[in-house]
Every structure is written in C-alpha cells, then in structure tokens.
C-alpha cells in the first residue's frame, strides 16, 4: 500500500519552534511528530510513503531516511517548487500513487490520533467507491466545515457545510483519507484544494464516504493545540498502561500522565504532572513544579521553578523561582532569568529574558 503525507510549508502557527526545525520534526511525545504517522502506516502494511514538502526538504531527507530500514518502508520526497495546496501534491506524486490499482492514504502531518489505517482500508474496500474521509465528532461544529450525509445512508456524504450557523451535524473532516487512484484524474497540477474542489466533485458523483474515528484526535499545528494534543496522547497511553509513561509510584509523579526520557535528570522534592513530557538530557532541579507542559531536549529547569501550559524549547534554561504559564513557548536556546514571570510569551530563539512579561507577547 501507499501513502502521501502533506507536510507543507513554513509551519508559521507553531513558531518559534519551527524557526529551528520543520514542523514534522518537532518532537511530540519525545519523537518527531511525523514518526507517529510513519510508524502507524508501516504497521498497517504501507510500504511506500511520499512526503509532500516545500520547506527545507534537505533537513527532512537527512532526518527521515534513517527510518526506512527501521520500519521497512520506502520514504520518497515530492518537493514542490511552489506551494500546491492540499490536492496539487497528489498530482505531483502521481507516478508513485498511481503506479497500480490499489488505494492510497492521504493525511495532514499536523494530525495526532489513534490512527485507524487498517480498519479504514477494510471499510473503503467494502463499500467499493472512490474515496473515504475519516471524520471526528466535535462539540462546537459551527467552528468547522461539517460533513452532511445523504438521507437513509449512514456513510455516503451528501455535501459539506462550512461553519454552519444552524446545526446540520457534528462530524468534521479529520484530515485523513483513503482514495482510489482514479481520483488523480480529477486533479490538475496547480495549487488546488482537496477539501474545496476535489471532494465536492467526488461527492456530487455519490462516490465519497465517511469513516468515524474512535478515540482522541487533535490538529497540533499551534502551541495551544500542541499542549492539548499532548494531554490527549498521554491519556490514551495511560488507558493502555503504556510503558512509555513513568510509573505513578515514582516520587515525583503527581496526578499521572508523565513521560520522562531515560536520560533526563530530576531533582529532589519535585511535583510533576499531570500531562508532562520531559525530553532527552533535560535537567530538572530540586522543588520544581511542572504541569501540562513539554520540556524539549537539553533544556534545564532550575530549583523551585513553576511551569504550566508551556513548551520549553531545546537548549533553553528556566531560572530559579521563575514562573511560566498561559501558553508560553520558548524557542531554541532561550534563557529565562531567576524569579522572572512569563504570562504567555512567545520568545524567539537565543533571547535572554530578565524582566517579567505580564501580558502575552512575542519577544523578538
């Protein structure tokens, strides 16, 4: 089987982290974000994976080629000379995606969930039509494009309603699809949208179905959602009693859902959790309080610091008695001085912060 991952461009929504690494390589749950998808695709029997990229492809190639042997897959890069939207990349990769009659998966690289690739392939084969979209239920459908089904048919899609004022349904496009190669004939090699152009055309021919996603789902393309997605991911691991989580018997674990890389060092009298990820070679001092946060590789948190709803970037340092909260994001190599308060700052790489940031701000 084949798959195309829409990696896309600059990852501006996840800055300042994406100023250092392309978004798919930013660690989510202590692994590059895209590796969660590659691993799940390989487990479902996918052998050919195409990454559609238009930003720093050289970095992506160097980072991901080593995983081919590990997962027994071929990873190829389809490099766009100009951004081609969400449908154009399929046409650009037509030689691979259309090389045989078997269907192929398409997914957005920002999506973290319990990937249902095997079940999705079985469902798609069973109905025999041209395409299947994975959908997820949301509490506030008025914020999204909603999938509406044909009367008396539970899966065949009738139409899409963008940000409906009146309730028409609560299922939204989850950014994961399986399509027959015939779909490629519907797409031109130009910047084009699969959601706004390709899917409505398949829909009008009665050839598009939906597949309900069970379990958690999150688009983690911006810091607030990255943190929420981390909580959902850790909760999912806890339900499966995953060995990736620190046991609750550890003296520093407070409230559960804590992931700690084996190379990290944690001081005395710390309270960590719930929903914390601590990366490789991180050093946490004594008496530190961490909750709902991510500490990326080589970062350092000094004694008695208090951190909540924050992403601490690679090689960054948080001073003694400092307090960070309210979706604060530190880029690479940021230094927060002792006793400094940061209330929602987005701080670009290599900055040194010696004064309080009382209201959310971008520090350049």
Swiss-Prot record:
<dbReference type="InterPro" id="IPR005835">
    <property type="entry name" value="NTP_transferase_dom"/>
</dbReference>
<keyword id="KW-0548">Nucleotidyltransferase</keyword>
<comment type="similarity">
    <text>Belongs to the transferase hexapeptide repeat family.</text>
</comment>
<keyword id="KW-0131">Cell cycle</keyword>
<comment type="pathway">
    <text>Nucleotide-sugar biosynthesis; GDP-alpha-D-mannose biosynthesis; GDP-alpha-D-mannose from alpha-D-mannose 1-phosphate (GTP route): step 1/1.</text>
</comment>
<dbReference type="InterPro" id="IPR029044">
    <property type="entry name" value="Nucleotide-diphossugar_trans"/>
</dbReference>
<dbReference type="GO" id="GO:0006486">
    <property type="term" value="P:protein glycosylation"/>
</dbReference>
<dbReference type="GO" id="GO:0070590">
    <property type="term" value="P:spore wall biogenesis"/>
</dbReference>
<dbReference type="InterPro" id="IPR056729">
    <property type="entry name" value="GMPPB_C"/>
</dbReference>
<dbReference type="InterPro" id="IPR050486">
    <property type="entry name" value="Mannose-1P_guanyltransferase"/>
</dbReference>
<dbReference type="InterPro" id="IPR018357">
    <property type="entry name" value="Hexapep_transf_CS"/>
</dbReference>
<keyword id="KW-0547">Nucleotide-binding</keyword>
<protein>
    <recommendedName>
        <fullName>Mannose-1-phosphate guanyltransferase</fullName>
        <ecNumber>2.7.7.13</ecNumber>
    </recommendedName>
</protein>
<dbReference type="GO" id="GO:0005525">
    <property type="term" value="F:GTP binding"/>
</dbReference>
<dbReference type="GO" id="GO:0005737">
    <property type="term" value="C:cytoplasm"/>
</dbReference>
<dbReference type="Pfam" id="PF00483">
    <property type="entry name" value="NTP_transferase"/>
</dbReference>
<dbReference type="Pfam" id="PF25087">
    <property type="entry name" value="GMPPB_C"/>
</dbReference>
<dbReference type="GO" id="GO:0009298">
    <property type="term" value="P:GDP-mannose biosynthetic process"/>
</dbReference>
<dbReference type="GO" id="GO:0004475">
    <property type="term" value="F:mannose-1-phosphate guanylyltransferase (GTP) activity"/>
</dbReference>
<keyword id="KW-0342">GTP-binding</keyword>
<keyword id="KW-0963">Cytoplasm</keyword>
<keyword id="KW-0808">Transferase</keyword>
<dbReference type="InterPro" id="IPR045233">
    <property type="entry name" value="GMPPB_N"/>
</dbReference>
<comment type="function">
    <text>Involved in cell wall synthesis where it is required for glycosylation. Involved in cell cycle progression through cell-size checkpoint.</text>
</comment>
């Amino acid at each position: 089987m084949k798959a195309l991952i829409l990696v896309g461009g600059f990852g501006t929504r996840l800055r300042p982290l994406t100023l250092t690494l392309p978004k798919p390589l930013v660690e989510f749950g202590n692994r590059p974000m895209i590796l969660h998808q590659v691993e799940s695709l390989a487990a479902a029997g996918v052998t050919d994976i195409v990454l559609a990229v238009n930003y720093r492809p050289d970095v992506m190639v160097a980072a991901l080629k080593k995983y081919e042997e590990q997962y027994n897959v071929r990873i190829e890069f389809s490099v766009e000379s100009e951004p081609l939207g969400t449908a154009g990349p399929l046409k650009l990769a037509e030689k691979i995606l259309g090389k045989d009659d078997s269907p192929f998966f398409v997914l957005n690289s920002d999506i973290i969930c319990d990937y249902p690739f095997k079940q999705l392939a079985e469902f798609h084969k069973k109905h025999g039509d041209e395409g299947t979209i994975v959908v997820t239920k949301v509490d506030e459908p008025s914020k999204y494009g909603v999938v509406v089904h044909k009367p008396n048919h539970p899966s065949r899609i009738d139409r899409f309603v963008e940000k409906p004022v009146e309730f028409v349904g609560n299922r939204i496009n989850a950014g994961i699809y399986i399509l027959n190669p015939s779909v490629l004939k519907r797409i031109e090699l130009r910047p084009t949208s699969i959601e706004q152009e390709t899917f409505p055309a398949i829909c009008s021919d009665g050839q598009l179905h939906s597949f309900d996603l069970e379990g958690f789902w999150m688009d983690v393309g911006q810091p607030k959602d990255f943190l929420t997605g981390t909580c959902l991911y850790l909760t999912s691991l806890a339900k499966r009693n995953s060995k990736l989580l620190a046991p609750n018997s550890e003296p520093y674990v407070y409230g559960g859902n804590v992931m700690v890389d084996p190379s990290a060092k944690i001081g005395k009298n710390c309270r960590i959790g719930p929903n914390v990820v601590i990366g490789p070679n991180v050093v946490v001092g004594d008496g530190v309080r961490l909750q709902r946060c991510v500490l990326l590789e080589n970062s350092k948190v000094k004694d008695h610091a208090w951190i909540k709803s924050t992403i601490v970037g690679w090689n960054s340092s948080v001073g003694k008695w400092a307090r960070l909260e309210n979706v604060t994001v530190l880029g690479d190599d940021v230094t927060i001085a002792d006793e400094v308060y940061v209330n929602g700052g987005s701080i670009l790489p290599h900055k040194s912060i010696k004064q309080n940031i009382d209201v959310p701000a971008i520090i350049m």
